[in-house]
Amino acid sequence: RVAIMNECIDSSMAERRRMGIEMLETALGGPPWTGFGINEFGARPRDYGFRPSYDELVAWLFAFIDILVRLGTSGVPELEDDARRILADKFRWIWRHGGIRSKLIDAARKLHAHRPWGEGWKAVRSTIYFFHTKRKDNEDVEPLPEILVTLERELEPKDLVSAIMAYVLSNRRDFWALDADYEHQGTNKFSEIRKILCAKAFKLGHEFAVSSHGLDELCPNLFLRDGMPYRVEFGKGLANGAPDLRIYWQQLVIQLDLQHKSQRDVSVIRGFIEETHSIDSALAQELLDQCAQHSELRFELVNLHPWQEFTEIDLDRCMSLLDDSDIQPHMYGAILWGEQFSNLPESRVLELAQRLLSKPNGDEVVLEALSMKLADKGDATDTLGLALRTIGISAAIQRFQRDHNDLGGYLDYAMERVIDATLRFDGNEAEKLEWLNTIFAVVDEHFGYIYSFEDAIGITAAWMPKEFLSRIFDGTEDQQQRRLHFINHDDSHQSPIAKIDVDILIEWCRTTKDPQVWASVASGINLWSKDGEQSPICLQDDALRFLEASPEPRAVLEIFAEHVAPSSWFGSRANVMQPRVEAIGQLVTHERADISKSARAVYEKLTDWVEKEKERERLEDEALEQRFE
């Protein structure tokens, strides 16, 4: 493993070097090390991964710690950073093994002697906190080793730059490791720690600005896109302590331009402008005008504005970039919903929203923004208002027409919120019908296969039930077949008409005076319910009420029977089907003779189906056993 790993790390190919680093990281990630592969019963031994004896483990960890020290002092910045990060991440895990502690301390000292190891200092402090401070009231807790206290003092940042690297320019979230005197108690402990660390970052920024240090000493970390949450406060501190704001601004921009484009984060710039605004607002406006012209800062222009006061002048500055082809519309989303933008005239916000719809993916930005605006607002309040509701449903129509792919369902959530807020209030009647027509136009186009935006479609059916049901049975024969397929549910996809109240379904079916629609609508009703893990499966009350209201219960029961077989399952399919069959079998004793008679006939067919399925599974199992023999 060491030979292969070293070959990868020494490779000229970036992907192989990354693979070598990952091998090094996983080598220190156990035990246990879990094996991957086929573990089914058979003639081969199962692979449970490497399970070393204690002596083997010590030898293993010694070898890989030596490699980490070699890489961490190699003089190659990329390798040094990776090695130092890995050992910091694994320090607390490795410290549990007493026989390796002296090796671990020696490695920490070597890395720190090469250059200050702030990540290691935080790793040591978190080890002290979790293994000792947090467990101080436990009887079986190990006394705090003096050698660990000594190591913590040795690794603690002693100069300004190393302190900034540890407190500000590090992506580790060891809140408990950064303030030894803080009592980590109470429901607000993390927000309190954040306040302390923000104040610390501001102070460090001020001290750095008044010092003789240059910004190049903090790069590239100062602008790395790597989740360092205190750089805004650090930027504020820089502005607060800068002897000359203009000159320091120019130095910041120069250092930003020297960094690789893909790695740039402008949080420090944002903090600098925000503090400048509190010192000299006219200068802050001048800096923002420069940002609008900068090749990189223009992409973050909205976020660079001080949030305490966002004016129409600021909006004009931001919107002046909107028609540029390389500007992403996501930058503007917060303006539509954020409290810090609430002082803007409604007409200007509507203008922005309307223009966003003409941008690529602008419809998604509008939907997500309006969803955020609706967050935590009561359903009875018309938060959006007529104009924003019009834009919101237009965004939904535009996005749904474009494609119906929504991996993860996040956009479906946003669209469902906007559609719900639009359909529940009067007005927008033309847009509501256009939205409904769009749904079925897309259904027709995709032959009834729509597996995204289920919640948005479902809430539409709930608010416009009669119109929704009527659309299913409108159109040509081909269109009706596609739409009936669309409402037919299975175990993995709920039918949109399942969101419609069963009383409305029954009333609508009765008004059509067409007995055949009952069976079609029945295909979308949720059938099975279960009170607890040990309780038997039974028909849902809504399904039973629909069956009892139907003029032809046999046809409805036949549809129910089609949903006895699961669309996916683990183990025996017959075992999944059996309790569902028994749920239908309970209807044999129904008080109505027509339902009882129909249930008996359907139950007999289903019982035969289950027996055939059991036989098929038995033959399949025998074949597998013979193959093993």
Which residue ranges define each predicted feature?
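Non-catalytic all-alpha helical scaffold/repeat segments
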Residues: 1-629
